């Protein structure tokens, strides 16, 4: 015979399962409606002092120009994109595509190198040029640098972080927002109002 505790336990489990499935459904619908896919969730520290609110977010390896901060409906949003380092790819491409100076100097023919006895028929010239081009291609393939990754742990892509300011928005002076980005750490400081209250007195006319 089931006791009252067993009945309450089953009801609680059913409610938890229902809430779980509803949250999964909401998450799926949000992913469908949102066009941007969030790849990175940066860590954040929020500290409230006597006179200010401090929000610190780690954004290592991200340029200041790729960070966007906004407040809409008491929701603070920090979003942007962490891009791959293109300088390394450009260096690799330049080193692999550009021939060395020694090779170019050897290939260039000067007037002093040729004599009348060195002139050959056209057929031999074409065969020699074909063989030289094949050798040059082999040398180019050997000189091309290959890149092999042994460890790949860094993540790139879009990032976004929300902070709900509803609970203490009445304390903050939004006109005093100050931002600082140094050594990969974004610091947002919002001063508190000198006189604030969460209650509003309404007079009767």
From Swiss-Prot:
Pfam family, one: HSP20
Domain sHSP: 35-205
Biased segments, Basic and acidic residues type: 134-147
Source taxon at top rank: Eukaryota
Segments crossing the lipid bilayer: none
Region: Disordered, residue numbers: 99-147
Keywords, ordered alphabetically: Stress response
PROSITE patterns recorded: SHSP
Biased composition (Acidic residues): 109-118
Family assignment from sequence similarity: Belongs to the small heat shock protein (HSP20) family.
Protein name (Swiss-Prot/TrEMBL): Small heat shock protein hspG12
